[in-house]
Amino acid sequence: MFRILFLLLFIPATGLAQRTAQGELQAAAKHLANPDGTRIDFQAETIAPNDMGSSPLSSGSLILKDNQFRLSFGSITAVFDGKKTLSYYDASENTLNISHPTNAELAMINPLIILTRSEAGYRTAMLPPTKGEKVIGLTPKTANGIKQIELQVDSRDSRPTGAMITLEDGTKIVTKITGISRTKASPGLFRLMKKDYPGVEVDVY
């Protein structure tokens, strides 16, 4: 009898927590849903597992429109066409890589893709809050290289403030958002063309 009562109490509470996490994701997505485009400025670093060091904190920018994005970070420019193609230019090596990434691979480059593409492949839950922020946890339902994504949002209006991706090997990719603003994103922003990079080496995966 006690077991039945426990289950009756526990199951609705679990459902409520799930709706809360989904609601926070939907509220966060609204801050990025500008019809002409959204610009996000951020700082990011990669922390190796077992305190083996980290990359220098670097600044970058991300332009979003619908499911498309353009990432500028150091020598890297990465563009996703919103369908299936990712173009990735590395100025330090003058190489242009073209691939058809999985949703998990896209999330490693742009964790906010979770807000504009389906997160159906993840279990969502509210994690303990930090000062001034709510934290949404997303755990893959099947192995995909990511152990967990933590998305931080402002506790007042659910505006995205940062993200941390923990990979299966323990590596952490930490991103802190420093600004979100409206922008006018032209279609050409979401294409990288070989002709724009003289002498570039092109690799297609």
Task: List PLM regions with ranges.
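Buried hydrophobic packing residues in well-ordered domains
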Residues: 28, 40, 71, 85-86, ...
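Flexible, processing/modification-adjacent segments and terminal tails
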Residues: 18-34, 43-44, 55, 84-147, ...
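Sequence/structural signature of outer-membrane beta-barrel proteins
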Residues: 47-49
